[in-house]
Amino acid sequence: MTLSKKIYNYLYIFFLVLIIVISEFSTNFAKAKTFVINDIEIQEKYDLNFNKIKVVDKAFKKAFEILISKILQSENKNILRSTDINQIKSFVEGFSLMEEKFVDDNYQAKINVDFNKKDLINYFNSKGIITSSINSIDVMILPILIDLKKNQIFSYSNNPFFLNWNLNNKKFHQINYFLPNEDIEDFSIIRKNIDDIENYNFNEIFNKYNVKNRILLVLLNQDNLIKVFSKLNLENNEMYLNKNYKDVSMKNLEQINDVILDLKNDYENKWKSLNEINTSIILPIRLSVDANNFLLSNNLENYLNEVDLISNY
């Protein structure tokens, strides 16, 4: 083996090791060339005006809206809702139609859509928008509702936020929640620490479930004003959130659900902030590979295509 070829091989190995090390400690790394949105349900009246291309275009639009809700902060996704269908179609890498059927003169189907990840990231970056990787996470949430007037803690079975939390899920949500079981001991721990509830960690409750990712949600209700304090611990990152909600009745399920969805969106934004793919900082690296070694070149190219942190090569 010649000296120059040895150097090329050493550089190649060094470069791959560098990428692997960076990727191992970064939430920005993803091993996929596409963003995949599955099981988009479509339905259209089947009559003389039926046009399958237009139906699929609607599915692309719907899939795109779900995607941007998954990977963009709330304030940014509204900017892109007006993206025209031709622009959206330019990002589509492929799609598959499933379960096509006709029911009562209606065409129904499910569609999976693959969007080109690098094209989308570059498009968003050109608009000054940072994307996040799609990374689902299981989180235990402990919603504690307190009536300040009565100095009363609601049991889980009487807490509308507890009862309705998992009834308000959206397809773009990446956080999968689970709640504790009704337990007299939990209630006793909460009541014991009611005077310092925003500072107490409630590890006695969380540790029973052996959970790493957790959210403490404290809701203080007085005269239809709800003061909310949230302490999030996601992948060893501690974050806090304080909000107020006015004119929320504990008897109005629609208002309760609106608060739940708003909080879930805030938690999604916090989680996305930990998974940002920031390619705005450009660090040029020169790498030489033997063009005659097709297998080596092909493997390297495939690997580079899969790394979000590499914008161009």
Regions found by a protein language model. Give the residues of each.
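N-terminal secretory signal peptides that target proteins for export/translocation
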Residues: 1-8
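Bacterial N-terminal signal peptides
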Residues: 12-24
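Short N-terminal segments immediately surrounding and downstream of signal-peptide cleavage
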Residues: 29-47
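Solvent-exposed coil/turn segments that connect beta secondary-structure elements
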Residues: 40, 45, 114-120, 144-148, ...
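C-terminal/domain-edge helix-coil "capping" segments
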Residues: 53-70, 112, 119-134, 171-174, ...
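N-terminal segment of the mature soluble domain
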Residues: 56-79, 137-198, 207-214, 300-313
